[in-house]
A protein has these predicted regions:
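A short, acidic, amphipathic alpha-helical segment used as a generic capping/interface helix at domain edges
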Residues: 103-107, 348-368, 385-386
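Internal, well-ordered alpha/beta segment that forms a basic, Gly-enriched binding/recognition surface
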Residues: 111-208
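Short acidic, glycine/proline-enriched helix-loop-strand junctions
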Residues: 134, 138-142, 383-410
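C-terminal regions of proteins
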Residues: 391, 395, 402-438
């Protein structure tokens, strides 16, 4: 019997409330940017800071309003953005062009809510350009991008950590200058500890999928990690993920799962695409094949032990470690934040293929995978596209491995019939491998 998460509605409500606060704020500060950024510095400006993050907003809009998403993408292309550029970027800019915005509770608001500032990171070539274009179209919104140097073990390199910390420290002075507000180190440090705690808690939740049956499937994982992206700096966010961890631990102890029929365990590398293409997810579900581990859902807003003595580990970090962190000064908090975000799995593989291989080997082993599904996104520069070719060679003689191009939100760029055929082939390969015939 399938287990129903009791915390499900709390997660949906938190995400929708954050978006509604941004849309309808009559006072306070609206802040926009990549939620792949360190968010805690924004909370040093006060509790009335409302955040709209590009990636989770674009993804949730595509899932909630697929027709609106297509109109947004078309509007952005008509306005001059390239056909092959990031689909999330075009959806986001398309809302600005159309002067309307849609959020997860079903609201479509006419009149785009103009942000007071843009606080973001620059990881791929489009990250800062995304918000530079939004700033330009909205009349020149003040913008501060932080240049991130990803790559294997970057969080252990003091030069890289200092480089990121220095930018954030200058960014705090910039925030004071453009808002006219005094920065509170006390509020910032509290938000920093919450931010780190949520990332560690999500890593703990994901690691529980090492058990059989895995308590969570990809559909739930996709739906449960966005609140950590939307705003992970609040006490409420910490409480949400603490409650979820406790519930999933109970599921493991009692052998329960949201999908108890798990004949095949799949490790997935790529951006989450099955939420937009249920016909592909259905092929896997009907065969009892479940994605139990995904670098995207695990590593976009979660932290793990990472590299230990040169080898990657998906084992979780003890949440008590966060409580013991010395965050007594602004610089201490900035350093801890820089290390935690540089340690995100999704950033490791963006700049380092040896890290990508290490993560894949560890995930296949630690999550006891029956198959490896590789689905690079055509328009995402930070997806691990080039590394997938090597991964096919590495794993093809070990476990069934299938690769096909996909797309996050723009169905025009996805070969649905071809992807369905490859997914069916993938199921047959796993069946044959389990019987000893492949």
């Amino acid at each position: 019997m399938s287990y129903t998460l009791t915390t499900w509605n709390d997660f949906k409500n938190y995400q929708s409330t954050c978006y509604r606060n941004y849309l309808y704020a009559s006072e306070g500060l609206r802040c926009m940017g990549s939620t792949w950024s360190v968010l805690a510095p924004l909370k040093g400006l006060g509790e009335d800071v409302y955040i709209l993050g590009g990636e989770p907003h674009a993804a949730s809009t595509a899932g909630t309003f697929p027709e609106e998403a297509r109109e947004d993408i078309s509007a952005a292309e008509i306005a001059g953005l390239g056909f092959h550029s990031c689909s999330y970027l075009k959806l986001f800019v398309g809302e600005v062009v159309r002067d309307k915005i849609a959020i997860t509770d079903g609201t479509i608001k006419e009149g785009y809510p103009k942000p007071d500032l843009i606080w973001t990171t620059h990881l791929c070539n489009l990250h800062s350009k995304w918000y530079q274009e939004v700033s330009r179209r909205l009349g020149g919104i003040p913008m501060y991008p932080i240049d991130m140097i990803g790559g294997g073990d970057a969080e252990k390199d003091p030069k890289i950590v200092k480089y990121v910390c220095d930018q954030m420290e200058e960014g705090i002075r910039w925030l004071e200058r453009v808002t006219g507000r005094e920065f509170s180190d006390e509020s910032f440090i509290k938000a920093a500890r919450n931010e780190i705690k949520v990332l560690v808690l999500w890593g703990n939740i994901c690691a529980l999928n090492m058990h059989a049956p895995a308590p969570l499937d990809e559909r739930r994982l996709i739906a449960l990690f966005p609140p950590a992206m939307v705003d992970r700096t609040t006490d409420e966010a910490v409480q949400l993920y603490e409650a979820l961890l406790k519930e999933v631990q109970h599921m493991v102890e009692t052998g329960q799962s949201v999908v108890p029929d798990q004949r095949f365990r799949i490790v997935y590398f790529g951006l989450a695409h099955t939420y937009g293409h249920p016909e592909i997810a259905r092929i896997l579900r009907d065969a009892g094949a479940e994605i139990v581990a995904s670098v995207y859902t695990f590593g976009t807003a979660g932290n793990f032990r990472g590299f230990v003595n040169g080898n990657w580990s998906w084992e979780p970090i003890d949440p008590a470690w966060v409580d013991e962190l010395d965050l007594s000064s602004r610089r201490d908090a900035l350093s801890a934040l820089a290390k935690i975000v540089l340690g995100w799995p999704t950033w490791q593989g963006v700049r380092s293929y040896w890290a990508l291989e290490q993560m894949a080997r560890a995930m296949v082993t630690e999550f006891n995978a029956d198959g490896l599904l590789l689905a690079p996104t055509r328009t995402c520069e930070t997806d691990f596209r080039n590394g997938y070719i090597a991964m096919q060679r590495i794993f093809r003689n070990e476990i069934p491995t299938v690769e096909y191009d996909t797309e996050t939100v723009d169905v025009r760029k996805m070969d649905i019939p071809g992807s369905k055929r490859k997914t069916e082939l993938f199921v047959h390969l796993m069946e044959a491998h389990k019987k000893g015939g492949a």
